[in-house]
């Protein structure tokens, strides 16, 4: 009996929630009665209209198949009726193969490509998505004007505000949230509830804490996993965090830079490659790294700007990637140096040796970001791209003449998309990313970039209204 059918029977499940992720990284779903699930369901899947998903099919060829991945079946802890969540792959009906533009299919192809190279058989990923918990957010963007307003009782700007029950103080200042105990940490209980929900859904929580920024910046660390499974788990984490916050009457955002003047939210990504059960990144070189790991780093540095198109895919991403807010803008590597975009964390055992890319952020589609990072690293290994000397000094304090010698991440989404367009060759190896998908992705993200660039900004009224 399949895992899904067993859970349906054991928990008297009434509904099946089929999940998939669109190009922009947002999880989508459709729900069907559990009584319709049988063995044929896992062979033939469920038809749906793909024309309504941005960046996918036109209306003239819209039929697509949601093919359930039985291994992902898990009970939904947030529904009143017993509901089973199953993550799906998108299948092209004419070929019964994975749809070329399905992010999960791309991630699967990246895993298969790794095996085909002989470099390794398993890629491990450990992302750390940060997020803000707010009490309320209001925003508007239309022809009459635009605005946003954040309401957060624990925000540094509310030291003199009036609240029902009084203002008790005890709030983290700007860049002061890492990491005092309660009552300064207002979010301990809600984070614990989020962790309980994550554990219910099969994720292994390792740590949770308040992050650096005021107004409720937080992080929940969960254990690493293989590429596709970890991308699935990122989507599960976002689902849990959003829904627990909603149950508490709060609201969460994973956008990279919701606050001006304080730290943004990153998604540092830890990575390693194993072959025959051995960590290929462990060696006798710098910081205990092997040549394989150094070449992997070289590939990420070489393709860093093109990677930004997937790892930092929003206009808001580049408001985080600026000096002065603990966001790494220099494409350099170092042991334990958090100002470098690639860090080699200290570990107790060679089995845990890994690298950490610090420039990605949680607006990224995890399937695309992880696949792209792997492809960049593999290109570095295949071409023996050495990253040069490590940068063991504080890169934030470099004099201008030294800083200009170190490559930097992109400064805007427009630049990132241009770099992705011209530097795509490493991504299309082995048919992992197709030119068709990259073209469609560039078109989709360019629409966002143009809209933001041409929209009238409230700050422009401050600067120019009285000219």
Swiss-Prot record:
SMART domains: Gln-synt_C. The activity of this enzyme could be controlled by adenylation under conditions of abundant glutamine. Its EC number is 6.3.1.2. Keywords: ATP-binding, Cytoplasm, Ligase, Magnesium, Metal-binding, Nitrogen fixation, Nucleotide-binding, Phosphoprotein. It is an enzyme of class 6 (ligase). Belongs to the glutamine synthetase family. This is Glutamine synthetase. The gene is glnA.
């Amino acid at each position: 009996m399949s895992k899904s059918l067993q859970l349906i029977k054991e928990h008297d499940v009434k509904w099946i929630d089929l999940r998939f992720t669109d190009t922009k990284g947002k999880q989508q779903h459709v729900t069907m009665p559990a009584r319709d699930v049988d063995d044929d369901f896992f062979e033939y899947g469920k038809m749906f209209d793909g024309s309504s998903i941005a960046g996918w099919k036109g209306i003239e060829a819209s039929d697509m198949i949601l093919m359930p991945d039985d291994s992902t079946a898990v009970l939904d802890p947030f529904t009143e009726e017993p509901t089973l969540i199953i993550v799906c792959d998108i299948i092209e009906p004419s070929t019964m193969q994975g749809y070329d533009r399905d992010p999960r299919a791309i991630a699967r192809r990246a895993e298969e490509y790794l095996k085909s190279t002989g470099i390794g058989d398993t890629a491990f990923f450990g992302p750390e998505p940060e997020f803000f918990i707010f009490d309320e957010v209001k925003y508007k963007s239309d022809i009459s004007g635009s605005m946003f307003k954040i309401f957060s009782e624990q925000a540094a700007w509310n030291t003199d505000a009036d609240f029902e029950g009084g203002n008790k103080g005890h709030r983290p200042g700007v860049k002061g949230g890492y990491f005092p105990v309660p009552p300064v940490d207002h979010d301990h209980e809600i984070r614990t509830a989020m962790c309980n929900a994550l554990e219910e859904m099969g994720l292994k929580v390792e740590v949770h804490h308040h992050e650096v920024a005021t107004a409720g910046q937080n992080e929940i660390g969960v254990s690493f996993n293989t590429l596709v499974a970890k991308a699935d788990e990122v989507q599960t984490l976002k689902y849990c965090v959003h829904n627990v916050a909603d149950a508490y009457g709060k609201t969460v955002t994973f956008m990279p830079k919701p606050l001006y003047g304080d730290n943004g939210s990153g998604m540092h990504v830890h990575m390693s490659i194993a072959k025959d059960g051995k960590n290929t990144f462990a060696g006798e070189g710098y910081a205990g790294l092997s040549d394989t790991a150094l070449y992997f780093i070289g590939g990420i540095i070489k393709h860093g700007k093109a990677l930004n198109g997937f790892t930092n895919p929003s206009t808001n991403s580049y408001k985080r990637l600026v000096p002065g807010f603990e966001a790494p803008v220099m494409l350099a590597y170092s042991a334990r140096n958090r100002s470098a975009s690639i860090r080699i964390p200290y570990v107790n055992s060679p089995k845990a040796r890994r690298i950490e890319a610090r420039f990605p952020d949680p607006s990224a589609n995890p399937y695309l970001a992880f696949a792209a990072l792997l492809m960049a690293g593999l290109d570095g290994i295949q071409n023996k791209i050495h990253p040069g000397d490590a940068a063991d000094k504080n890169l934030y304090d470099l004099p201008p003449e030294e800083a200009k010698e170190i490559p930097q991440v992109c400064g805007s989404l427009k630049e990132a998309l241009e770099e992705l367009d011209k530097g795509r060759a490493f991504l299309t190896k082995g048919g992992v990313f197709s030119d068709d998908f990259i073209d469609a992705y560039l078109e989709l993200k360019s629409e966002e970039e143009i809209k933001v660039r041409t929209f009238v900004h409230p700050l422009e009224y401050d600067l120019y209204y009285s000219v």
